[in-house]
């Protein structure tokens, strides 16, 4: 009897979980972006039982794989083990090219999924034409009732999901309703896709007015560059259960807090 490739794949998944003794389900690997990309040297797989601050027991997502143990003592000490490395979690590993038993970086990709936001505050629409003193005076003259109505902080950010899916957080769907407001919020680019490559986080974003078009293109697996999409490469400087710090190629740091797992 001919055995289908789907059946073989299913058996491999079952064996992976048996090796790791994990009850968690296997995550779906990210989809490839439509644009040409540099080679990804990161290995992807599961954290296995026996992992600690000095060693990562790892089961790679590939045929005939066996659990491997990587030395992560130096990486952990230098802050390049990102996340808690929980048994059964989906992780990415960068291997030392000069020592195949050492991981130079590991990132818990299950833990990075979720909703991450930062707080933004409104500013006067004509703030660029006013001095700081004039702004303070104008705010002081504003009745408390109007302050409560307009000076409301918002949470901007993104939700990272399975299969490279992402959605922006903090978008004002009814944009027209804010046109008569004396204040405005900082412009934000909307995250529509994410992935990890070579130990870095890649976020694909579009302008607010292109969001609907871009999301339709994502659903159809089309190249979102036609919607003005760009992909930013970010270093993950720190990640805890509730905090995420990213750094841009220009050296700017961005801090987020988790609002939903």
Regions found by a protein language model. Give the residues of each.
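Short boundary/loop segments of OB/S1/cold-shock single-stranded nucleic-acid-binding domains
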Residues: 23-44
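Short, charged beta-turn/beta-strand-edge "cap" motif at the junction between a beta-strand
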Residues: 50-51, 94-101
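Tryptophan-anchored aromatic micro-motifs
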Residues: 110-150, 192
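N-terminal helix-cap/turn-to-beta initiation motif at the start of protein domains
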Residues: 82-85, 102-117
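C-terminal motif of bacterial Sec signal peptides marking the signal peptidase cleavage site
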Residues: 16-19
């Amino acid at each position: 009897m001919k055995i289908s490739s789907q059946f073989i794949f299913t058996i491999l998944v079952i064996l992976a979980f048996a090796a790791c003794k994990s009850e968690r389900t296997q995550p779906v690997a990210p989809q490839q972006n439509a644009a040409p990309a540099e080679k990804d040297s990161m290995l992807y797989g599961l954290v296995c039982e026996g992992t600690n601050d000095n060693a990562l027991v790892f089961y790679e997502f590939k045929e005939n794989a066996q659990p491997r143990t990587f030395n992560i003592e130096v990486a952990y000490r230098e802050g390049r083990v990102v996340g808690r490395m929980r048994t059964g979690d989906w992780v990415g590993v960068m291997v030392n090219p000069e020592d195949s038993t050492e991981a130079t970086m590991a990132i818990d990709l299950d833990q990075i999924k979720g909703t991450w936001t930062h707080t933004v505050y409104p500013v006067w629409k004509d703030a660029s034409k006013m001095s700081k003193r004039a702004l303070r005076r104008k705010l002081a003259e504003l009745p408390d009732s109007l302050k409560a109505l307009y000076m409301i902080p918002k949470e901007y950010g993104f939700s990272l999901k399975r299969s490279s899916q992402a959605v922006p957080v903090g978008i004002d769907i009814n944009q027209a309703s804010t046109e008569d407001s004396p204040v405005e919020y900082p412009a934000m680019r909307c995250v529509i896709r994410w992935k990890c490559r070579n130990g870095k986080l890649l976020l694909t974003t579009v302008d607010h007015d292109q969001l609907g078009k871009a999301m339709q293109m994502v659903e159809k697996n089309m190249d979102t560059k036609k919607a003005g999409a760009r992909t930013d490469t970010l270093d993950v400087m720190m990640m805890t259960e509730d905090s995420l710090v990213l750094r841009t190629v220009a050296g700017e740091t961005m801090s987020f807090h988790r609002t939903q797992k």
